[in-house]
Every structure is written in C-alpha cells, then in structure tokens.
Regions:
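Alpha/beta-hydrolase active-site loop
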Residues: 103-124
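Short beta-strand/loop motif that positions the catalytic acidic residue
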Residues: 183-185
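Flexible "cap/lid" loop of the alpha/beta hydrolase fold
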Residues: 164-181
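Accessory cap/linker subdomain of secreted extracellular hydrolases
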Residues: 187-230
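Short substrate-entry loop that stabilizes the transition state in hydrolases
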Residues: 44-92, 155, 167-168, 191-193, ...
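Bacterial Sec-dependent N-terminal signal peptides
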Residues: 1-21
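Cap/lid segment of the alpha/beta-hydrolase catalytic domain
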Residues: 85-109
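A domain-start/cap signature at the N-terminus of enzymes
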Residues: 17-50, 62-68, 76-80, 106-109, ...
Length: 289
C-alpha cells in the first residue's frame, strides 16, 4: 500500500510539473509563421483570464521568459500567459512592428496580427475572451500604445513597461475608445527616455515625452480624479531608486491611467526595484469582468 501511495505521489508530482511546463506552438498569420509560448498553470479553469506578453527589441530570439516573473503569479492566481515571439527586421533584430526605421521592410499590421494570435489562443486553450490583457517591455510596450491608438478590442487593459508613443502614431491616430493603461518607466532610461526624443537622436524615430504620452490617455479616458501621489522605496535596500505612483481614475466605463515613475532607474523591467509582475496583475485584476 505504501508503495502504491509513493507511486501515485510521484505520478501526481510529474503531472503537476508537466501541467505547468511551457508549451511552444505556431500558427500562420497573414502569410507569416508566428510562434508563441504558453504557460498554463496546474488547475487552470475554463474561461480563465489570459495575459499576453511582448518582449523587447532583441539581437536574438527571446527564449527565456522566466526573468519577467509572470509565471509564478499566474500559477498562484490561475491565469494563462502567452508570450508572443517577435519577428526579425532588416537588421535581424527580433521584435514587433511599431515603425522603427529598421522595421520599414516588416509587414505593417502588427496590431491585427497580435489580436489574431490572441484570439486563436483563447479558442485553442478555452480561455476568457473578455478577461484578456496585454503587457510588454520596451518594443513590446511601444506596441501596447500602438494597439491602443488603433482601437483594438481584444484586450481590456494594457501595461507597457519602458514603453513610448512614437510621434507618427500620435499624429496619425485618434484613439476610437478609452482603455486603461499602466506604464512603469525609469526616469534615467537612456533607450526610451522619460523626457522623449522629438529630434530622433536615439534613432528609433521621434517620440513623445512620457508626460504628454500619458496626458493623452488621461484626457481620452476622461479621468476625473487625480489621486495623491504615493512614494515608496525600492525593494532593494542598497538602491537609491524610489517609485512615485501616479493614479488618474474615474474614467469612462471605469477606465484609469496608472504611472509608476521609477526615479533614477534605467531601461529595464524594474524587477530589482519593485515586484513588477505582481503590480501588473494587481492592475489587471481591477479590470476583471
């Protein structure tokens, strides 16, 4: 009997580990093979929430998503994570089309493609078509803004990290509907400057200062409340960084705009200064329906 119990325990352990293993799959979208990696936690239910993640602009294919810390949160909260892999541009950097100069040769319907991938994932894994959210780092964060301006309806809320609004997007589009946005950004970011780069000194294309970028969404969402700012220290006792939390609430249909201003921090996911994945899920959880 003890032997049978041991065998069953080992089997259960194996099953749990397998259930939480990353699953990589592909599908054809607009003539291009798009690859994604799923994390489906053990015990996930039908119609569970889905968080879609887009990585940063990279010299090589991004394979290690563990450093973003979303999986442990998903395992506890029982939501799925879909990591969508970027495509190469003319310089063989992997990412998502947002209009960087090296991306001129890429197909220019990234919002539509990301939404189609997400909808296929919802169907394939029986996930919620309502409680679906998107987050991204750097290039992936920039894509969050492009998707918001283009009026996607697949995602209920967006959480760009180190994201920027390129000026061509700002000039071309008028966002057709409000959407909740949570930006996390370092003030010492030299890649995606907090202060913008309207002269295109960085080579990404001209982009807005973050205060203007965020101000657009505060106005578009018709937020009526500015909550008192809260300042919290970095979780790293040795760090001189600190986080100023800005909250604009009371928007149309409950929309809001959050900004975590990580003072002194560079271009990063900010996991050394705060529990970024936890913070993003806390924001998304507010918008579950």
């Amino acid at each position: 009997m003890r032997r049978l119990t041991l065998i069953l325990a080992i089997f259960a352990s194996f099953t749990a580990a397998f259930a939480q293993k990353h699953i990589t799959d592909s599908l054809m979208i607009n003539g291009q093979m798009r690859t994604y990696t799923m994390f489906l936690p053990e015990g996930i239910q039908k119609d569970a929430p889905l968080v879609v993640f887009m990585h940063g602009y990279s010299k090589k294919k991004v394979k290690n998503f563990d450093r973003f810390g979303l999986d442990p949160v998903a395992a506890r909260e029982k939501f799925a994570v879909c990591y969508i892999h970027g495509l190469p541009d003319s310089t063989n950097h992997y990412g998502y089309y947002v209009g960087y100069p090296p991306q001129a040769s890429m197909q220019k319907h990234e919002t539509s493609d990301i939404c189609k991938i997400t909808e296929a994932v919802q169907e394939r894994y029986q996930l919620s078509k309502v409680n679906t959210f998107a987050t991204g780092m750097s290039n992936g964060g920039d894509l969050c803004y492009l998707m918001a301006y283009e009026g996607q309806t697949t995602f209920r809320a967006l959480a760009p990290v180190a994201g920027i609004t390129l000026n061509w997007i700002f000039q071309k589009y008028e966002a057709p509907h409000p959407i909740s946005i949570y930006e996390i950004h370092g003030t010492a970011d030299k890649t995606s400057s907090w202060y913008g780069d309207m002269e295109n000194k960085g080579g990404w294309g001209a982009y807005l200062p973050l205060k203007i970028s965020i101000g657009y969404w505060v106005a578009r969402n018709r937020c009526t409340n500015i909550e008192p700012t809260d300042t919290i220290p970095s979780k790293d006792p040795a760090s001189t960084h600190y986080i100023v939390q800005h909250r604009f609430t009371g928007g149309t249909d409950g929309t809001e705009v959050w900004v975590d201003e990580v003072v002194g921090a560079p271009h990063t996911w900010h996991a050394k200064d705060m529990n970024t994945a936890e913070a993003i899920w806390a924001f998304f959880r507010r918008h579950l329906k």
